[in-house]
Structure formats: structure tokens, C-alpha cells
Amino acid sequence: QVKVEKAECDTSNYNLTMVLSCPQSKEILYRAAKEWLATHIQNFQQKFQYDDKVTGTIKFRNSSYLHATKSYRQKATIDMTGTFDYMVTITIKDFKYRVKTEDAVANWHEYFIFNGTKTSNGAKSLDMKNFFLWSEDVNAMKSYSIDAGKIADGIWAQAKELEEDDF
């Protein structure tokens, strides 16, 4: 059985942290994380940035679907779609692991620009704090937080499966 020890969101930077405890060893959890990520994160090998089995650390860049809206002059609604791009750091110890997301940036291709927007190769980006201040859309962060939760849950499900296979 898994237990959530900590789940928090740093609202000043929109970093998410989840710490979970479970009966599996570091070795099983590490293997589970690598297997689950490789099969469930699209293009994982291209996103992969750091891997250290000794410290139990895995880092990669991930993307989540972005959809937000904002009313403009109480008439038209601006509908923005794109991605949240962010760093995921998974730290694994015996009977415990942490999934942390940080350095999130909103990216989109629509034509509008607002204060703080950076443009590169036709794509527009904005740090998460300014994006959420702009959008005023309480649902805008759902896919980002749900995807981080799926990673934490996927590691646990894979670890259970691996442990059962070992017997």
C-alpha cells in the first residue's frame, strides 16, 4: 500500500512536490520508475536528462497539454492552447520516493502577446506565475498537476507489478 506523505504546490513558482512511502525497496522503485517512464512518457529518451542509480535520481523534461481562456473587454474570449514544459525530478530511496516538477513554462502559437511574453522561432512562452496571473483560469493548471500525479501513481503501480513478478 502506498501512502502520500506530502503533496504541495509552491504557488509563487508553480512547483509541485509529492512524497510517497511504500513497502518496496529502492532497487524495485528505481526499476519501476525507469520502466514506467520509458513506456508512458512519449519520446522519453529524447526528454531524458539525468540518471544516477546510486543516488536514485532521474531527471527529464516533460510537457503537459495547455488550455486556458480569458475574457477580453468583457466580450470576446481568448482561447489559448499549447503546452506546459517543465523539469521532473524523481528521487528514490528505500520505501519512499519523491516526484517534483519545477521550471515550468507555458508555450503556445497563437498570435496574441501580453506583458512578459518571450518569443523564439514563432513560439511564445511565459513563466508559470505570469501565465496564471494573466489567464485567471482556475482550470489552466489541471493537466500539469494531473500529469505529475500520473507519474507518481505509475511508478507505484509498476513497482507493485515488479514485486509480484519477482515471487
Segment roles from a protein language model:
Residues 1-167:
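Ser/Thr-rich, low-complexity intrinsically disordered terminal regions
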